[in-house]
C-alpha cells in the first residue's frame, strides 16, 4: 500500500471519531515521535494558531480560577459544555485553576450518574482529565472512583441485553491503567519522571518512572485484563457493545489507544479493537436490529456482546502471515463495507470466498450490505478469468491503459499465495464442498431454506471460482492453446497476474513510449514486490521487468516524450480519432488520399501480437498465419517491427494490418532522405539509428530472459 493510500485510510478513520477520540489518538501518535519532530510540530501549531483570537480568549478563561468558580452557579448542562471546551486548555502548573476544576468535576459526574444524563460527555471529561499533563497522581487516583461508578451506571442501564455487570466494571476500572502501564513508551528515550503526562515542552513530552507512567500506579493486577487490550487496534468500547441504539460517542471509553500496536500496514494495524472482534450469533441479543453501516460511526461493534475472554482468544486473520486476509480491511473500505470488518476477521481466505447471502443473513447483516458482499466476492472469484481476458487483449495489440487500470483495481483486493502450506492440506479436501458453512458460521445458524439456497448459490459460483480456493479442472482456452503457452492452474492468481505483467512489459518495450503507462506499470510492480502472495521467483521477474522498462525509458530522447501530447493532438485532427493513434490501415488509406505514395510513415511503435512475437511454437500470430508463411515473417521481422500497425498503448485494434505490411522492396535501413520524403510536415518525430538499436537490444534481452526463465514458473511473456 502506497504512503498516500495509508494516509487516506488513517484520515478515513480520523473523520469518524469525535473530537475527544481524535485528541486521544493524536496524543498517542505524538508520543512516538522524536524530539525534533515534536518541536517541529509545536512550531507549526503555534504558527497556525497565532492569530486565533477566540482561542486566546478561551485560554484566558480556562486558566482563571475566578471565572471557573463562577460556573458553579450555572446549570449542569451549561457547566458540562464549558468544561469540555475549557478543560483541555488548562495550563500545567496552574494549581489554582486546577483545584477549581477538581471541585467541579465530582459534582458534574455525580449529577450525570444519578440522573443518567450526559454519560458520553462525562466520559470525555474523564478522558481529558486522566491524560491531561496538569493533573497529578492524586487527582487521577480520585477520578478512578468516578470511572468505576460511571461504568457501573452504564452497565446497569444496558445490562438487560445479555451483558454481565462484572465485565463492564472490570474493564472500566482497569483498561486505562493497564494499557498505559504495559505500553512501551520508551521508543525515543526522551521521557522524564514528571507526572505531568504529555506537555508542550519537548523535555516534558513524556514521563516515565519505574512501575509508573504519567504518574499512574497500577490499581489492579495486569493479569485481570486480556492481553488483546494492549495489542489490537486503537480504541474500544466493550461496555456499550451490547446496546441496541448506538450513541455517537461510543468509543470514548477508551481513554488512550494502546501503545504497543504491532507494526502492521495501515488498514490493518489501525483497525479498531471493536472492528476486530468476532460477531457470532451467540453474541447477539435476540432483539438486536440488523446491522447497518449507516447506523452510527461505531456500528461495527454494535452487534457484539461478547466477553473479554472471547476477545483474548479470538482469532484475527488480518494479522496472520500468509492468510491472504491482510488486504481485506482496505478492500472493504473501498466498497464502503468496512463496518463489517469484524465479520471477516475470524474467517480464513477460503471461508470468505465461500460466503453466501444466507450465512450473512444469519449474522444480522442488512439485506443491501449482504447482497453487495456476495456480489463483491463473486467478482473476486472471477479475477483469474479477467486476467486471462486482459492477456488476450494485450496480445491482440489493444490499448494498455484499460488493462493497467484493471490491474490497479485488482491489487487492492485480497490475494492469497498459491499452494502455500496453510492452504494445500486444508483447502483442497474441501474443494467439492465450497458452499459448506465456514467455521465461524455453523450450519445450525441457518434455516433449511437458507441451506438449499446456499447450495444453489455455491453450484453456480463454483465454476468461476478463479481464486476462491475451490479449484476446478482448468479448461484450456483457445488463446492459450493457440499460443502454446502452458496454462496456469485455477487459483494461481499471483502467477496469472505475473504473466499479464510480463505481457504488458513486452508491449511497453515494443510500442511508442507513453509516460503515463510506464509510470502506472512501475507503480504496479512496486506494490507487487512487497506483497506476500508473490513468490521470490515472481518478484525477481517483476524486478527484472522494472529494470528493463526503466532502462528503455531513459534511453528515449526527452524531446520525443515531451512532444507526444502535441503529436497526438495533430494526429487526432488529421484522422478524427479521439485520444488514440491511427491504425496501420487508417494511416495508409489516409495518406493515400493526400499523397500518391503508398508507403507508410516509419513508426517507432512495435506491434506485439500482430508481429507474432508472443508465441512459443512459432513467431507467427493467428492473423498472420492466414496470409503469410512463417519463413516470410521471420525474414521480414525487422521491417515489420518498424512499419506495421503501431500497436502501442494508444492504438485502436485493427484486423486489416496484413494488407498494409511493408514490402520487401523497401531497404531495411531507410535513409534520412527517404524518411523526410515520406513524412508529412506535422509528423516530425525523430527516429535515429541509435534509438532503433537501443530498442532492438532491449527487446532481444527481454525475449531471451523470458525464454530462459519459462521453464521455472511458466510465467514467460514470450
Swiss-Prot record:
| Alphabetical list of InterPro entries matching this protein | PHAT_dom_sf, SAM, SAM/pointed_sf, SMAUG/VTS1_RNA-bind, Smaug_SAM
Primary location class: cytoplasm
Q: Does the record bear Phosphoprotein in its keywords?
A: yes
One annotated Gene Ontology cellular component of this protein: synapse
Q: Where is the SAM domain?
A: 323-396
Show the ranges annotated as biased composition (Low complexity). 453-466
What is one GO biological process annotated to this record? nuclear-transcribed mRNA poly(A) tail shortening
The protein in question is named Protein Smaug homolog 1
Its source organism is: Macaca fascicularis
> Which lineage ranks, top first, belong to the organism behind this chain?
Eukaryota, Metazoa, Chordata, Craniata, Vertebrata
